[in-house]
């Protein structure tokens, strides 16, 4: 599973005659997604932020500047290769598959039936979770009709 670390730093600059140093506030919130297979995690914010934050006060800037730093640590999910050969995605994002029944015993099937079995058909919506689980990088539009 992937883990996500987030830190926000707010820096505000004040007028130099009123205050001698700029104000720096550090607010951090670290979110970890853990799983049973992963024993590694990010230890605090030391991997995200430098040890010392230096700021310079300017006389005409009194705005509050903030930025957010994201660090994404995780592993690639593996594609199930047998499923990758069986399923495709259309231009609209639908998952399609081949029809079964066209491998053998074709002599007793008429041409109309063989032609119908040659075409691709859509995967049922109830099977989308199974297919997407096997093919994590498939570009699927779940809202396509």
Swiss-Prot record:
GO annotations of cellular component type: chloroplast; ribonucleoprotein complex; ribosome
Main location: plastid
Entry keyword annotation includes Ribonucleoprotein: yes
Free-text disruption phenotype from the record: Embryonic lethality. Embryo development arrested at the globular stage.
SUPFAM superfamilies linked to this entry: L35p-like (SSF143034)
GO terms, biological process: translation
UniProt cross-references to InterPro entries, sorted A to Z: Ribosomal_bL35, Ribosomal_bL35-like, Ribosomal_bL35_CS, Ribosomal_bL35_sf
Molecular function GO labels: mRNA binding; structural constituent of ribosome
Listed Pfam families: Ribosomal_L35p (PF01632)
Keywords: Chloroplast, Plastid, Ribonucleoprotein, Ribosomal protein, Transit peptide
UniProt transit peptide range: 1-56
Subcellular location: Plastid, Chloroplast
Transmembrane segments: none
Subunit structure and binding partners: Part of the 50S ribosomal subunit.
UniProt family annotation: Belongs to the bacterial ribosomal protein bL35 family.
Protein name: Large ribosomal subunit protein bL35c
